[in-house]
Amino acid sequence: MEKPAGRKKKTPTPREEADVQKSALREEKVSGDRKPPERPTVPRKPRTEPCLSPEDEEHVFDAFDASFKDDFEGVPVFIPFQRKKPYECSECGRIFKHKTDHIRHQRVHTGEKPFKCAQCGKAFRHSSDVTKHQRTHTGEKPFKCGECGKAFNCGSNLLKHQKTHTGEKPYECTHCGKAFAYSSCLIRHQKRHPRKKP
């Protein structure tokens, strides 16, 4: 036997569902019967795999002045809060916290310049120096003075320029007291002072 032809149940649109939820919230606020939503509690599985790989663990032990203490059950506990700077330059004695900084510094002594400009072949110790240098080829000047609008290819040049607006002259001659905005100007000035003969 066939079912009598009747109306099909209409599925609500997302907008209609949202309207129903909003009106239910309004009713809860008016009645004051609102309860916090229940969250299902899922038990967590204990972690079986180690948090750090052996290489990472070795790095952590190298980067920290590791100290151990016994907890209340006599088990040694690693305390990684006392940082040290384990990388010392064998040439000049400078100390570095990170191995990468130590490696970069070594290039000062070895003269190694592994980063080259693709356009002119000029070599640099650091990749950031190549980026700055390439602006001389492209003409890019991303650092603009907020006071006068003059643009510079290097942030340090902008900082130097801004002293012209502030009038700051932090470099003072020890012989005569004259002040300069730039250290290079002070050095040039000091060469003009007669040297004392012993």
UniProtKB/Swiss-Prot annotation:
One of the record's GO molecular function terms: RNA polymerase II transcription regulatory region sequence-specific DNA binding
Pfam family, one: zf-C2H2
Stretches with biased composition (Basic residues): 1-12
Major location category of this protein: nucleus
Top-level taxonomy: Eukaryota, Metazoa, Chordata, Craniata, Vertebrata
Keyword list, A-Z: Developmental protein, Differentiation, DNA-binding, Metal-binding, Nucleus, Repeat, Spermatogenesis, Transcription, Transcription regulation, Zinc, Zinc-finger
Renumbered zinc finger spans (C2H2-type): 87-109, 115-137, 143-165, 171-193
Name this polypeptide is given: Zinc finger protein 41 homolog
Basic and acidic residues composition-biased segments: 13-38
UniProt cross-references to SMART domains, sorted A to Z: ZnF_C2H2
Function: A putative DNA-binding regulatory protein associated with meiosis in spermatogenesis.
GO cellular component: nucleus
Region of interest called Disordered, as start-end residue ranges on this chain: 1-55
Disulfide-linked positions: none
Location within or outside the cell: Nucleus
